[in-house]
Amino acid sequence: MPKHGKKYRSAIEGRDIAEILTLEDAVAKSLGASFAKFDETVDVAICLGVDPKYSDQMVRGAVTLPHGLGKTVRVAVFCKGDKEAEAKAAGADFAGAEELVAKIKEGWLDFDKAIATPDVMALVGQIGRVLGPRGLMPNAKTGTVTFDVATAVKETKAGRVEFKVDKAGVLHAPLGKVSFGPEKILDNLKSLLDTVNRLKPATAKGTYMKAMAVSTTMGPGFKVDPTTIKKFLEG
């Protein structure tokens, strides 16, 4: 079992981290337990009642959080012609086709998100082994393969979060920074949960959102009572 440092132990002192909480309380306690000297990211982990080994139960999508993520996102757009100027006008940090692919083949990866127009995906496929493992490969299901590059760039810069359930059926996503405070974090969480709810596979059986935990980068996770999720979304 990994050993935790003094700051971690101090953060959880007097707190029952095994307690099952409402969403609101889990967020509040997570923010209250933050102890790092930097502005930690608040994360959520959601255990879904799906079996990802079946393609029709794969939950994958994207959502633009109302309050963003509180960080600068560097965006690269793979495109040609007029789309290059459109991407840059919308705020893209890098735009191009062959030249960008060539740079990446040489080891350059100074961007956080990638977008591509459909007509250059064959070219982008040449660097799929580089982009894929880093979560940078553009994908139509998350809206990052599109001819509407202006909208995609603006949404990505504004705090667009892509998510995908892992092999264990758990979905991980950031919700913003500790400095946002509970109200903005809860707003972002509601947007995420609404989107995940809409993506529920028709073949999924039983409880969809089975378990949830909220944590900060360095802090402990606080468990959420899944029966309170529906009430939170309807509130």
Swiss-Prot record:
Xref: InterPro entries: Ribosom_uL1_bac-type, Ribosomal_uL1, Ribosomal_uL1-like, Ribosomal_uL1/biogenesis, Ribosomal_uL1_3-a/b-sand, Ribosomal_uL1_CS
GO BP: any one term: translation
Pfam family, one: Ribosomal_L1
CDD domains on file: Ribosomal_L1 (cd00403)
Gene3D superfamilies per record: 3.30.190.20, 3.40.50.790
A single GO cellular-component term on record: cytosolic large ribosomal subunit
GO molecular function: rRNA binding; structural constituent of ribosome; tRNA binding
Keyword field: Repressor, Ribonucleoprotein, Ribosomal protein, RNA-binding, rRNA-binding, Translation regulation, tRNA-binding
The keyword Glycosyltransferase is assigned to this record: no
Annotated SUPFAM superfamilies: Ribosomal protein L1 (SSF56808)
Superkingdom per UniProt: Bacteria
Purpose of the protein: Binds directly to 23S rRNA. The L1 stalk is quite mobile in the ribosome, and is involved in E site tRNA release. Protein L1 is also a translational repressor protein, it controls the translation of the L11 operon by binding to its mRNA.
Protein family (similarity comment): Belongs to the universal ribosomal protein uL1 family.
Subunit structure: Part of the 50S ribosomal subunit.
Protein name: Large ribosomal subunit protein uL1
Gene behind the chain: rplA
